[in-house]
């Protein structure tokens, strides 16, 4: 039986490129090499495409994907050179220029099927402010928030925040993930400093009401038919679940399934599917919720390319549902091909 080519894109231009490499290495080891051969391409911080390794069998434990320290300029290619007939692309890219519709539009221009959400849902879900506005209309509960866009009246934004929210608040770049650039502010001075920090990563800033809550996550899989997982819980060993704790120090543990009442579990799964559909989602996503002591549920964010390392919540949630990491990858490829075929059929 001939194998299908699975193209892994990893690295990228965003601050989350380290996570991308870890995710891609996990995917390359979990792939069923009876069904796929894998070709990998590293995207540098400057946006260059580098042809890296190819695998026809499971790589050894010490095999690492090539990155900035090991690639050579002679390996650089034109981005369009990744095209291969009958291949499917898995863009294991997190954050801006990877998860925001940019790479998805590029792949659609090349007529390449790909894993994950389409251009529209990727770009909307990447922007936390736009996501909030759409989910408000859809009736999905969220914590109170304000926003600031660079160039607008900063003093007015601070005043609105002081009026509508109470400290502590969380200040986030609207278009970043993995806790990059996020700060907790306990007073007005810290709020202003947090806005300055967030502006280094984005020109659109979300300011959210801080809540004392458990962090519960639900996996989503599907196109027209949407499946969800039982929730899992992030059990933090640090005060703030930041990028360093999440990916570098690994100072978190997870309870899968989360220890929550059945009615809470059911409601979260319903909200997750509702949010996914409201944003036009397809392929996959992870929906992150807050659960307060009084039982209130708030949707925090919807991540269209969640971490894919062997210790990441998304694949572990599906393993708990009986879908192995390897079979999850197969299912994502099928869903990606299905969406590609549908897009092509609409071009009449």
Swiss-Prot record:
GO molecular function: ATP binding; D-alanine-D-alanine ligase activity; metal ion binding
GO cellular component terms listed in the entry, alphabetical order: cytosol
Chain's gene name: ddl
Domain ATP-grasp: 132-334
Organism (species): Streptococcus thermophilus (strain ATCC BAA-491 / LMD-9)
Entry's family note: Belongs to the D-alanine--D-alanine ligase family.
Cofactor or coenzyme needed: Mg(2+); Mn(2+)
EC number(s) on file: 6.3.2.4
Binding site for Mg(2+) 2: 301, 303
Catalytic activity field: 2 D-alanine + ATP = D-alanyl-D-alanine + ADP + phosphate + H(+)
Keyword hit for Metal-binding: yes
Pathway: Cell wall biogenesis; peptidoglycan biosynthesis
HAMAP family: Dala_Dala_lig
Gene Ontology biological process: cell wall organization; peptidoglycan biosynthetic process; regulation of cell shape
Name this polypeptide is given: D-alanine--D-alanine ligase
Primary site of residence: cytoplasm
């Amino acid at each position: 039986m001939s194998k299908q080519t699975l193209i892994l894109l990893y690295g990228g231009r965003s601050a989350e490129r380290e996570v991308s490499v870890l995710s891609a290495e996990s995917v390359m080891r979990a792939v069923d090499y009876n069904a796929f051969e894998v070709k990998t391409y590293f995207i540098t911080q400057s946006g260059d495409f580098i042809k890296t390794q190819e695998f026809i069998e499971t790589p050894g434990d010490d095999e690492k994907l090539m990155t900035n320290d090991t690639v050579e300029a002679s390996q650089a290619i034109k981005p369009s050179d990744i095209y291969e007939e009958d291949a499917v692309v898995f863009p294991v890219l997190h954050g801006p220029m990877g998860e925001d519709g940019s790479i998805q539009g590029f792949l659609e221009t090349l007529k390449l099927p790909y894993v994950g959400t389409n251009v529209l849902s990727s770009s909307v879900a990447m922007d936390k402010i736009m996501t909030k506005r759409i989910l408000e209309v859809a009736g999905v509960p969220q914590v109170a928030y304000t926003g600031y866009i660079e160039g607008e009246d900063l003093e007015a934004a601070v005043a609105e925040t002081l009026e509508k929210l109470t400290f502590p608040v969380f200040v986030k770049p609207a278009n970043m993930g993995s806790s990059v650039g996020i700060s907790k502010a306990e007073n007005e001075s810290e709020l202003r400093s947090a806005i300055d920090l967030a502006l280094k990563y984005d020109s659109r800033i979300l300011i959210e009401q801080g809540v004392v809550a458990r962090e519960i996550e639900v996996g989503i899989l599907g196109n027209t038919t949407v499946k969800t997982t039982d929730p899992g819980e992030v059990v933090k060993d640090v005060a703030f679940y930041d990028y360093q704790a999440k990916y570098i120090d690994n100072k978190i543990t997870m309870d899968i399934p989360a220890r929550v009442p059945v009615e809470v579990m059911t409601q979260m799964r319903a909200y997750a599917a509702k949010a996914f559909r409201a944003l036009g989602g397809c392929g996959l996503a992870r929906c992150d919720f807050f659960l307060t002591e009084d039982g209130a549920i708030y949707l925090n964010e919807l991540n269209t390319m969640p971490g894919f390392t062997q210790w990441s919540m998304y694949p572990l949630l599906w393993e708990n549902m009986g879908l192995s990491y390897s079979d999850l990858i197969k299912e994502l490829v099928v869903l990606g091909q299905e969406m590609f075929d549908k897009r092509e059929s609409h071009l009449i």
